[in-house]
Structures are given as C-alpha cells and as structure tokens.
From Swiss-Prot:
Keywords: Adaptive immunity, Immunity, Immunoglobulin domain, Receptor, Signal, T cell receptor
Protein known as: T-cell receptor gamma chain V region V108A
UniProt xrefs under Gene3D superfamilies: Immunoglobulins
Residues annotated as signal peptide: 1-18
Location of region: V segment: 19-116
Origin species: Mus musculus (Mouse)
A GO cellular component entry from the record: T cell receptor complex
InterPro entries referenced in this protein's UniProt entry, alphabetically: Ig-like_dom (IPR007110), Ig-like_dom_sf (IPR036179), Ig-like_fold (IPR013783), Ig_sub (IPR003599), Ig_V-set (IPR013106), TRG_var/const_region (IPR051117)
PANTHER family tied to this protein: NON-FUNCTIONAL T CELL RECEPTOR GAMMA VARIABLE 10-RELATED, T-CELL RECEPTOR GAMMA CHAIN
Organism superkingdom: Eukaryota
Keyword hit for Signal: yes
CDD domains xref list: IgV_TCR_gamma
Amino acid sequence: MLLLRWFTSCCLWVFGLGQLEQTELSVTRETDENVQISCIVYLPYFSNTAIHWYRQKTNQQFEYLIYVATNYNQRPLGGKHKKIEASKDFKSSTSTLEINYLKKEDEATYYCAVWMRWSSGFHKVFAEGTKLIVI
C-alpha cells in the first residue's frame, strides 16, 4: 500500500497534478464550535515539507494564518485560547488546520499551500480550498 501511494505521488508530482487535496468543498459549524480542515499532501518528501495555511474572506485578499513544518513545530495563534492550530500526520500525509471557538468573522475559504521547486524556481502551490460557513 505504501509503495502504491509513493508511486501515485511521484506520478502526480511529475505531471504537476494533485500535490494537495482538500476533500471537503465546504463545512458548516455553529458559533463557538470547533472545526478541523484537512489537506492531503501527495509529495514523496512530506516529512520535510512546511504546510502553510491561508484564508480568504469574501471580496478580500488572502490572509496568511499559520504553518507547520513538523508535528512538534505547531505555531498556535490566538494566545492562551489557541484559536488556530496546525498539525501534520506523517502516516496519512495530511495536515490539519483546527479553528476553535468559531465566530461569524471566521467564515471564509481556507487553503493549504506548499512551496514547489520547478525549473523556473520556487512557486507556491495551493489546494482547492474549503469554505467554512458559520451559523
């Protein structure tokens, strides 16, 4: 199974497809609940890759939120309440963004991203995004 996943990752990487996947197009949560948004990373070097998280509110620019390089290198935002956290699961090649104590102003589309090396240099590659709706 690991060999198949590695082979698929390499093929997708070679053709420039599917490096990142956010499987949920949208999620809906109530105010004061928590949400987890996942990003599957199809890269053979996941353990050495920093995963960056952004959000874009309606009619606004992208906002950089947080990154995670290793599972022990989380950078929580929001002080003691840990409003936003990011983590990595090496077994599933997945990064998870957790947003706690949701408020209406958290409503946005959330994106994971990684830096990829191409012949022309480094470029940031984004997943499709997951829209968070807070009711």
